[in-house]
Amino acid sequence: MERKQEAQVTNECDFLITNSKFMLENFIKDTPKWKEHSTAIPNGYDEEDFKGLINQRNGQDKFVITHTGTLYGKRNLTEFLEGLKIAIEGNHVNREDIEIRLVGNVHESVAAEYAEKYNLQGKIKTTGYMNHRDSIQMLYNSDILLLIIGKVKGAENFYSGKIFEYIRADRPVLAIVPEGGAAAEV
């Protein structure tokens, strides 16, 4: 159904703009006419969103890992938490020294299930929905930012727009993304 809608839209447009070269290359492969009538313009961030915010890490004794946005279906914490479990069991990370913040629409019951499964009770905090500015402040209040692109067909062709806000926040980014794809290239 999505492919049909996509074809309807692209058949009617005069010029095609995508936000990644990977996506553009796929359009050109499917419809060669786009080679001469298309371009890729990457997403970015709005500098105004960062003005007046305090660029300061959490100031706690915890190492704060933050994910902003929605987790659902194949975009989930499983790979990250499996890796963290290995690091904790190998004594590379002290469970007591970390806090995982899920900023956005992540149901508390989902976070509780992860906490129980990975023995991280009290370590996974949810904030619920936050306005955009407060969400960006949470980036500044973090030690590392978690970016997850789910394992779905075509995931290598796109990235989340938040990647540019993550980079602008000047924190390390732990990216669980398709190798060689658009998000990995950024």
Where are these regions (language model features)?
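Conserved donor-binding/catalytic core segment of Leloir-type glycosyltransferases
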Residues: 57-75, 81-82
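Carbohydrate-associated surface elements
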Residues: 22, 41-44
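Nucleotide-activated donor-binding/catalytic signature segment of Leloir-type glycosyltransferases, i.e.
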Residues: 92-104, 109-134
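Nucleotide-sugar-dependent
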Residues: 75, 131-137, 145-164, 174-185
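Nucleotide-sugar donor phosphate/pyrophosphate-binding loop at the beta->alpha transition
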Residues: 1-8, 47
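A short, active-site helix/loop in glycosyltransferases that binds the activated sugar's phosphate group
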Residues: 7-37, 184
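Short acidic alpha-helix that forms the nucleotide-activated donor recognition element
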Residues: 8-11, 113, 131-142, 168
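Acidic anion/phosphate-binding donor-loop and adjacent secondary structure
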Residues: 28-29, 44-61
